[in-house]
């Protein structure tokens, strides 16, 4: 996947289009990510044991194709590429400013 946990992203499409947030959880097998304060849905929870039931607001997962990384160097949404750095490690690279993405 082109984004990882902790990356700042912008939502490209849907009702949350244009919203920015940080990735809380990455689900590579399902190709989905959970972004903080984006795609809030209401979840109905039954009371179990000590926990009280009710309606909770939680962040639902978005498909990874609906988000784009915001480059930490240039601050713009951009696609990412890969290259091998001087130490022989594979790193992500911003396609706009050609800077390494941590």
Curated annotation (Swiss-Prot):
One of its GO terms (cellular component) is ribosome. Pfam families: KOW, ribosomal_L24. GO terms for molecular function: rRNA binding; structural constituent of ribosome. One of its GO terms (biological process) is translation. The keyword Ribosomal protein applies. Keywords: Ribonucleoprotein, Ribosomal protein, RNA-binding, rRNA-binding. Part of the 50S ribosomal subunit. Belongs to the universal ribosomal protein uL24 family. One of two assembly initiator proteins, it binds directly to the 5'-end of the 23S rRNA, where it nucleates assembly of the 50S subunit. One of the proteins that surrounds the polypeptide exit tunnel on the outside of the subunit. PANTHER family: MITOCHONDRIAL RIBOSOMAL PROTEIN L24. This is Large ribosomal subunit protein uL24. It comes from Herpetosiphon aurantiacus (strain ATCC 23779 / DSM 785 / 114-95). The gene is rplX.
